[in-house]
């Protein structure tokens, strides 16, 4: 049983890493095919006049969204999963360092390294640089912030702040966040493909572990 649990731990961790790499790689300019589907659509529908974020905040939107900045843990990652990195015009300071630990950063580093820094991010926590954000003037801010932080930032910058949440690739709030990002950036079809891909991977893991008692299932930190 111990040997089985070790194998499952390694397998689950490997799947988590591979998922992150595959989902991000789909948005790169390489012609190499991957197992995850890639949408050929660049824009799916007309932008609504307002949107309700993960906290139930109703945020008024501009007529068009051609640019964004992403703040907080997971926000930029999910935008890259949605293949919306071309609309990013500012990044947090941590994105100016290339790292394999963040596949989306590693694959898009040549773009991110030259973008203005609009927040601290990383271990520095949620510290937006309001003046720099106003300078780059994005159409919308996508932020993995608390409701209070988002309200404060929106009041200071005058720019719509839509809150998303990233609690892991199999968390329901990530599905909701991807749907929000898809609507904001005109990537609904792509985001649906990503959600379906992750749900299929989750179901596969559940099928592989269904005969193991819950108290004997290994846990993985990713």
Segments from the language model and where they lie:
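Bacterial signal peptide processing site
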Residues: 27-30
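Structural recognition of the beta-strand scaffold that forms the well-ordered cores
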Residues: 67-72, 89-92, 140-144, 161-164, ...
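C-terminal motif of bacterial Sec signal peptides marking the signal peptidase cleavage site
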Residues: 20-25
């Amino acid at each position: 049983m111990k040997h089985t649990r070790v194998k499952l731990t390694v397998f689950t961790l490997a799947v988590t890493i591979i998922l992150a790499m595959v989902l991000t790689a789909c948005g790169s300019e390489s012609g190499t095919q991957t197992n995850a589907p890639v949408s050929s659509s660049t824009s799916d529908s007309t932008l609504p006049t307002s949107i309700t974020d993960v906290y139930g905040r109703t945020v008024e939107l501009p007529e068009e969204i051609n640019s964004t900045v992403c703040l907080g843990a997971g926000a930029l990652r999910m935008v890259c999963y949605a293949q919306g990195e071309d609309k990013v015009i500012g990044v947090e300071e941590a994105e100016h360092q290339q790292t394999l630990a963040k596949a989306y950063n590693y694959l898009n580093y040549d773009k991110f390294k030259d973008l203005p820094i609009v927040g601290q991010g990383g271990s520095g926590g949620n510290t937006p640089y309001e003046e720099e954000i106003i300078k780059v003037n994005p159409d919308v801010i996508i932020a993995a912030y608390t409701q209070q932080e988002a309200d404060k930032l929106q009041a200071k910058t005058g720019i719509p702040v839509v809150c998303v949440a990233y609690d892991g690739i199999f968390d329901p709030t990530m599905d909701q966040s991807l749907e929000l990002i898809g609507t904001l950036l005109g990537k609904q079809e792509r985001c649906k493909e990503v959600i379906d891909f992750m749900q299929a991977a989750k179901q596969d893991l559940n099928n592989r572990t269904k005969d193991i008692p819950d108290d004997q299932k290994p846990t993985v930190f990713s």
